[in-house]
Amino acid sequence: KTFLAVAKAVASLQQGLVKKIVLSRPAVEAGEKLGFLPGDLKEKVDPFLRPIYDALYEMMPYDQVEKKLANNIIEIAPIAFMRGRTLEDCFIILDEAQNTTKIQMKMFLTRLGKNSKMVVVGDNTQIDLISKNDSGLIDASKKLKNIQDIGFIELDQRDVIRHEVVRKIINAYDQKNSN
């Protein structure tokens, strides 16, 4: 999921369709918060964004990614710091969106500015919030499914490209959860 979103973002940047890529992700995983991690903001968010970096490095040379990060052409923007922004001429990705709250999701979605595209990526089976009912991804998919210019793509175990065994694992969990 993340790889596909990053591929589209990189292609859009390289084709001149956008001026910038903005990458965001909830900074809370399994109850941990950024404030408890050592370092400055970049050092705190980097571990959370590792899957996005991995995808970027597969599509662009390392030095090119680093240069675009340094020049803010690729921006890392923790969701906690998005309030008040309008993101224009950007390709915006929200990864691990299942771990946003309803309030965070609404705030994030309303950052969309002119000539921007937004891709929200998540998996409703991997919610780390205390209550799965609080997931902004689930809430948004219910509220926005019939709005023109907003689309949803759902993937399942047939779409897994990591390893054939991963598909079998997902299938086993899906069968176990349906019983």
Predicted regions and their residues:
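Conserved helicase motor core of SF1/SF2 NTP-dependent helicases
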Residues: 2-94, 98-179
